[in-house]
Amino acid sequence: MLLFSRLIQQSKNPSGFLGKRMMKLWNRAYLPMFVWAIRYLDRTSYPAILDVGVGNGRSTILLKKTFPQSTITGIDISDTAIAQAKQIEMTNLNFERRDVRETGFSDESVDLITAFQTHFHWQDLEASFMELRRILKSDGMLLLACEYNKLSYFLPEVQSEEAFRRFLLSVGFELITSQRKGAWILYKIVKN
């Protein structure tokens, strides 16, 4: 049980050798989910993008390749993750250690917010979504994607689409659509 608890903690905030190894494993496991999810974005241009829970930044690189004209900031609470991500050098791509509950971004400054395989780890789901709503532009999009079974383990109270829809409405968001592919689910969310 101690090992399981340690692995759960590493998935929330990777650190040290184990955290670095897990991030490499996640790249293999979750980058295909990222590629699938971004196909559901409606626009071909998002000037300012925030990628939440970036790990070592590999998904953020794919975002930059998909939207080369965008300014993209990747955030994570893990010092280890951000140290690895900062090794990536691309124009208009930045990585910062920040908490999703208090990003420090200006009101309505982001066109697209993405979070892949991470929102079920946020310490305060309501505060996190309220912060994302604050920084998202009125015509912006929030795209979440994750393994569906993680929701039943970490967020059983909002696992059903209807419960998640109600939760989003309570924090000023609207669920536009959800899509499933095998074990994955994505949510397209806008301000209401």
Question: Where would I find each of the regions flagged by the language model?
Answer:
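A short acidic, Gly/Pro-enriched loop at the edge of an enzyme's catalytic core
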Residues: 101-113
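Class I SAM-dependent methyltransferase Rossmann-like catalytic core
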Residues: 14-31
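Conserved beta-strand signature within the Rossmann-like core of class I S-adenosyl-L-methionine
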Residues: 140-147
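A short SAM/SAH-binding and catalytic strip from SAM-dependent methyltransferases
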Residues: 112-124
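Core SAM-dependent methyltransferase catalytic element
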Residues: 180-192
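Class I SAM-dependent methyltransferase SAM/SAH-binding core
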Residues: 48-52, 56-102
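Conserved alpha-helix/loop element of class I SAM-dependent methyltransferases that forms part
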Residues: 28-45
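A short glycine-rich, Lys/Arg-flanked "PGG" loop and its adjoining helix->strand segment in the class I
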Residues: 126-138
